[in-house]
């Protein structure tokens, strides 16, 4: 009787027994062919949402940031909550690409492009809120430590707003370089298939002369690993800095040291849910069912379930520390959340963030496209 262990054969990450040529044709099809009906529907919804957002920004700048609910007693309103939300969903892209690359998880290859692109646009969106929050966005450059003609006027390095500027700009730079580096082979592939001279010229510029030589691939892997090593601690540090916006205040219920790990776990949680939402839509719109498989969706759901449990543990820890502290103001802050006028929002949050991901314990549910899409939307809410 043999005593050694034989691992079972893993399921292929790409379905359909496709050749390299088949993969190239399928991946290039959305660029080389006219958009289908599903794409136009998704694009129309995105354009409507974009125009709505532009209108809201113009109204806010014209009316004043008081329209967001900000006043002398309310310092955290529509702007900072949306800022944290966008930064949070931006973290999943770097985490999927960087951490899973370092751990040699091959299943990242089907979803990392979408996640990285989501990161870039989410970080840009997040950066808009501190700028608008200033009330005078045309003076946003004042947030940078630039030489000026106002004598001793300088940025306040003790301000969380300045911390956010450094965190967001650094994260955007590293994420952009990481995303572009990963795109080089794909851009070169589209360059070689391009027919129109203008398109060929553009793709030649953005692919940086990639030829596919062994030396190119060697440098590609080395740079990818270096960037992944830089981006991984960046994921942890950026949202820890964002959490300091709240943790450095003296308001009961907010002045707590649990915020950095709690915010990081929540960011990964919401970010993976947003990636799941986009992947399910994209696999349908772009006909990529063979590349974004049920195996990818199931693994994403497992991570959502784990991070949702971590967030739930953080909620319970907050309540316990408030009780254990014996500080009546701290206890009242948490008791008011659960029993005060906004009790319904508190329990709705607990249901969405803690209870709903637990159904992913059941394999039949976590491999269901409809259930996965609904849960990802619920978590994002």
Question: What spans do the regions from the language model cover?
Answer:
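Long, contiguous internal "core" modules enriched in hydrophobic/ aromatic residues
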Residues: 30-57, 152-349, 362
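Membrane-helix interface "capping/anchor" motifs
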Residues: 106-107, 361-372
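Hydrophobic alpha-helical segments of multi-pass membrane transport proteins
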Residues: 354-361, 381
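The first (N-terminal) embedded transmembrane alpha-helix
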Residues: 13-24, 45-52, 86-92, 233-242
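Transmembrane-helix bundle segments that line or gate the permeation/cavity pathway
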Residues: 2-18, 58-69, 73-76, 83-214, ...
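Hydrophobic alpha-helical transmembrane segments
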Residues: 87-95, 348-357
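Central hydrophobic cores of alpha-helical transmembrane segments
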Residues: 371-380
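Generic start-of-chain signal for non-secretory N-termini
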Residues: 1-44
């Amino acid at each position: 009787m043999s005593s050694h262990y034989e691992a079972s054969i893993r399921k292929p990450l790409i379905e359909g027994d496709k050749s390299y040529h088949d993969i190239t044709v399928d991946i290039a099809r959305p660029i080389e062919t006219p958009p289908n009906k599903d794409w136009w529907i998704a694009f129309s919804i995105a354009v409507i949402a974009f125009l709505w957002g532009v209108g809201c920004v113009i109204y806010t700048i014209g009316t004043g940031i008081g329209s967001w609910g900000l006043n002398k007693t309310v310092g955290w309103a529509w702007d900072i909550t949306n800022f944290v939300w966008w930064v949070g969903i931006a973290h999943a892209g770097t985490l999927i690409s960087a951490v899973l690359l370092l751990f040699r998880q091959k299943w990242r290859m089907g979803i990392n492009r979408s996640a990285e692109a989501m990161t870039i646009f989410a970080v840009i969106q997040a950066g808009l809120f501190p700028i608008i929050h200033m009330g005078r966005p045309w003076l946003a450059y004042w947030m940078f430590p630039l030489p000026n003609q106002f004598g001793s006027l300088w940025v306040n390095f003790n301000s969380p707003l300045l911390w956010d500027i450094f965190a967001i700009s650094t994260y955007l730079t590293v994420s952009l370089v990481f995303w572009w580096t990963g795109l080089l082979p794909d851009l070169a592939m589209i360059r070689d298939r391009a027919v129109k001279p203008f398109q060929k010229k553009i793709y030649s510029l953005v692919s940086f002369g990639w030829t596919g030589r062994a030396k190119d691939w060697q440098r590609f892997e080395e740079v990818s690993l270096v960037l992944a090593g830089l981006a991984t601690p960046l994921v942890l540090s950026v949202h820890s800095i964002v959490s300091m916006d709240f943790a450095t205040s003296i308001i009961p219920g907010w002045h707590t040291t649990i915020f950095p790990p709690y915010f990081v776990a929540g960011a990964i949680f919401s970010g993976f849910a947003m990636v799941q939402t986009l992947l399910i839509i994209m696999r349908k719109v772009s006909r990529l069912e063979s590349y974004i498989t049920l195996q990818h969706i199931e693994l994403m759901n497992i991570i959502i379930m784990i991070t949702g449990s971590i967030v739930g543990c953080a909620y319970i820890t907050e309540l316990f520390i408030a009780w254990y502290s014996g500080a009546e103001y701290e206890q009242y802050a948490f008791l008011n959340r659960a029993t005060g006028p906004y009790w319904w929002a508190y329990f709705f949050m607990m249901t969405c963030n803690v209870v709903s991901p637990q159904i992913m314990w059941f394999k039949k549910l976590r491999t269901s496209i409809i259930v996965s899409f609904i849960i990802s939307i619920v978590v994002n809410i």
